[in-house]
Amino acid sequence: MASGCTYDFIVVGSGSSGGVVAGLLQRAGAKCLLIEAGKHFTASTFPANEADYSAQMFWGGGLEYDTRCLMGFLRGKCVGGGSIVNQALQDRFDDIALGDWKAQSGIDYFTPEAMDPFYTAAEDGIVLQTLPAEQRNRSAQLFIRGLDHAEVGWAALRRGQCDCGVEQGNDCIACLGGCHRDSKQSTLIAYIDPAMPKGLDLAAEFLVDRVEHSASGVKVHGHNGSGPKTYEAKKCILAGGSFGTTQILLKSGFRDKLPALGKCFSMHPQYMSFAEFDEPVDAHKGAFQTVKSSDKGLRKKGYKLENVYAPPVSIAMLYRRGGVDLQRFMKRYRYYACVEVAVRDEATGELSIDRKGKLLIKKEITAQDAARRDDGLELVRSVFAAVGAKSMFQSPMYFGLHLMGGCAIGVDPRTSVVNEAFQVHGCENLYTADTSIFPNAPGINPALSVMALAHKLSRQLVKG
């Protein structure tokens, strides 16, 4: 894998988009290079604790912040990207999400029927399990009871996993730093590892600075520990997600040609509330996140509730106090249940860069976002009260895990960055089909839909 070698395809980013695209192109016989800024971990080398994996497997050493330092963003930085550090939840977008995309983008294939073959292909490429009732810990049971009391619908979650061993005493919360059992169906497991022995080249710990497009191909300029390098390919697929792909295009000078570049950023802002109980809840034990709210009324209102938790360091950060107060709070770690409000936010954020190329994130919580948040938090309080919570605490910190937009897809280059064929407008050899192309927030976990889009793009590229 020498600098200057010409590939059929270069894929930048190895998460739910890039990992899938690279694996599928290799299967089709293409000469392909997969570039990833993070390290190449395996089940035996994932960091053993929260402090180490936060520092080593996420951009910003764990968290990135907006320009006002009011909200934090989590973004995986390792081979496999976010698919390594997420909870492997796999949901299709509904007709509401796809209908809104179709209306804003002007693209006809954003319907459940047209996307079905690509969703099916994505689902067939991994092992899926719907979590059974016997794997619900006490936190999930309390959540269900509270939702039932509030007459809010709920459903079991479906995850990409094959052998978590919960019945043997394994705790899935550890997989937020990578799955040590290779059960989680990350792109590393499902696509990248199988493709590498068959010819897929991998350049890990390589940071792309800019891309240079021409009619004959694309040059990818970047650097690693050995210094600057340039790779060349006939075609390049940017798959760095909302932040990564947008930043590369901004640093490559595309903003002058594409005024929509950096616009339409959204992130499903998430607000975590805790309830203390007299008896241990042990929300960190067993299967992590087994049920969700599934309610047409909440969908219409623009938010959902999720039964989540976090490891100790993250919980301490969410408390946002120190000294004796923090010690007292953390001593009760086993006694808390947590419910999160995830808002389907307006795509009003903007991504830009400073003179040194550093990413700048501007995101306001709009009046509509705030109204949805407040309605959700009020519902959470009633859910906790219904199941006998001793006290309640809402974290003042909020954050985004689903980073979307910046390179919106659409038919009009004045209001979008990527066309219906996933090409950057005016660049026939430069593509993207990751979360950066989302024209607005779907209000649903994006992982499976990104994989479906990756399958659609891959079929198109293979056909030529």
What residue ranges belong to the model's regions?
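N-terminal glycine-rich phosphate/pyrophosphate-binding loop and immediately adjacent elements
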Residues: 1-101, 112-113, 222, 257-276, ...
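Short hydrophobic beta-strand that contains or immediately precedes a catalytic carboxylate
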Residues: 34-35, 202-203, 432-433
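Dinucleotide-binding Rossmann-like beta1-alpha1 core, especially the glycine-rich loop
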Residues: 56-58, 69-112, 123, 129-153, ...
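Conserved redox-cofactor binding core of oxidoreductases
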Residues: 108-208, 398, 402, 406-408
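A glycine-rich dinucleotide-binding beta-alpha-beta segment and adjacent secondary-structure elements
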Residues: 157, 171-177, 210, 360, ...
